[in-house]
Amino acid sequence: MRLLALFFLALAGSASAQKAPYDVFPEAAPPYYRVRYEASDKPGELVYPVNYTVWVPPGVKALRGVIVHQHGCGEGSCKSGLTGAFDLHWQALAKKHDCALLAPSYEQPDKAECQMWCDPRNGSSAAFQKGLVDLGAQSGHPELSKVPWALWGHSGGGHWAGGMVLMHPERVAAAWLRSGVPLLEANPSRSTIKTHTVPETALSVPIMCNLGTKEGVTVKEGRFAGAWASNEAFFTAVRSRGGLIGVSVDPFTAHECGNQRYLAMPWLDACLTARLPETSGEPLKAMPAEKAWLAPLLGTEAAPAAKFSEDKTKAVWLPNEAIAKAWAQYVKDSAVTDTTPPPAPTKVKIKGNEITWEAGADLESGIASFTIERDGVAIGSVPEKSANPYGRPIFQGLQYSDTPVQPLVKMVFTDTKAEAGGKHTYRVIAVNTVGLQSK
């Protein structure tokens, strides 16, 4: 109780300061919806304010699920959640499966205890489910409160997503845990973290433990060097009981997300395709065991489960052949291949010398940029220069916790060299992150 009282004192003493950095975020106009809850001083409830933003695919008749993109700990990561629902690439995955895309932003103060939200038992599970009810009412999709969840989490968000699997396995279609997992055995050096138990029903939920090689796999020192020990312990405990769990190690990164989305998207796509019921309200379907592939832990080659000769209870589980091949490429150089061009931009409009358009992302490789042609000749690109310190260049930019940068990049180009009064034909071409162009 004393620890909880200290949290409330810290919050009360800095309440006015908590408007920043959480007070700057994109407008939520349909198909975006937002709810925000203040901090609670009631035992067991969420002690931090939280902002939930959801995107609902335009025209969807009935939602079949919700994809949750959960940030990590600390102010920098928490505020990055404010743009998560606006990510065009994650929207492409959601749209394919008639799912909503939801991104929380827990307003954790600087240096405050992350466990007070990233352990879902501390009120964030209940707040999340209340958010689904309220957002369902706002959007006209009350089924949002009942559909299955596909969870993605980074760092403390991985801890949260894994905890939600263990608390609500019947609701979770799949969970991708980037650099964070629930603790199953007490760690004396991290006494604020409470342990979880793994129920039998959680063993049928597909889980991927994903982390960087510099988080204790090959680099044994540094702030995040303990991540591998936690991931290995969680993987071993779940897999030894037959759980559907894998491990994928980014060969270049530390705690930053890097290029993980190019494996996470296909992996979640495969799991949602296999598990989502055709009719909303029906139970999740089981993963087809006959399609599974296995690989040695920290290995680089996978094989069909029926042909895997090593101990299967210690092997990385992969849902099918296509994902096994993408996984092998990812753990080698993170360059997951793609041979499909992105969708062509639509609703291209010219007003004076300003060109605007709309575009959806390529599910496999997202959007890197747009090329603008005037009369068949390229005259510029948006953005002019694409820089991403954490992985492939992305049109919307990429923050540490895998969300677009603010302010959101607009789909607009000004032709400053067009002849006044001249008639021109313009074309906008989408370019994905492997360099393929729309047709």
Residue ranges and their predicted role:
Residues 17-66, 97, 149, 154-164, ...:
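A domain-start/cap signature at the N-terminus of enzymes
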Residues 60-112, 184-185, 217-219:
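Short substrate-entry loop that stabilizes the transition state in hydrolases
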Residues 116-143:
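Alpha/beta-hydrolase active-site loop
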Residues 173-261:
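The feature captures the conserved acid-bearing segment of alpha/beta-hydrolase catalytic domains
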Residues 241-243, 251-346:
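Alpha/beta-hydrolase-fold serine-hydrolase catalytic core, especially in secreted/extracellular enzymes
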Residues 369-421:
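Recognizes extended acidic, P/S/T-rich segments that occur
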Residues 415-436:
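Beta-strand-rich modules
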